[in-house]
């Protein structure tokens, strides 16, 4: 699902809201999450999950084509940890349809 599909689904479930207003709300929520992460804050949506940032130190990498060692700069990356309710719902909804590993 892409953002425009999310906006459309929310607008369909809330006919009293214009789709443009829903789009503005979704954009505002996403902007606030990104701004909080940029400040180094953690964003927790109880039951859904938590967004945070992780700092990856500089390291020596390798060019897979040539095998040459290349320096990789330190970077900050977004991280998402699912909430308990989401994990439970995903596991409950998948039920017996979940793929199993073939260890025979």
Swiss-Prot record:
Pfam families according to UniProt: Bac_DNA_binding
A GO cellular component entry from the record: chromosome
GO MF assignments: DNA binding; structural constituent of chromatin
Lineage: superkingdom: Bacteria
Composition bias, Basic and acidic residues: 83-95
CDD domains listed in its UniProt record: IHF_B (cd13836)
InterPro entries registered for this protein in UniProt: Hist_DNA-bd, Histone-like_DNA-bd_CS, IHF-like_DNA-bd_dom_sf, IHF_beta
SUPFAM superfamilies attached to this UniProt entry: IHF-like DNA-binding proteins
Keywords annotated in UniProt: DNA recombination, DNA-binding, Transcription, Transcription regulation, Translation regulation
Region of interest (Disordered), ranges: 83-104
Any one of the GO BP annotations: regulation of translation
Subunit structure: Heterodimer of an alpha and a beta chain.
Family: Belongs to the bacterial histone-like protein family.
Known function: This protein is one of the two subunits of integration host factor, a specific DNA-binding protein that functions in genetic recombination as well as in transcriptional and translational control.
HAMAP family attached to this UniProt entry: IHF_beta
Record's protein name: Integration host factor subunit beta
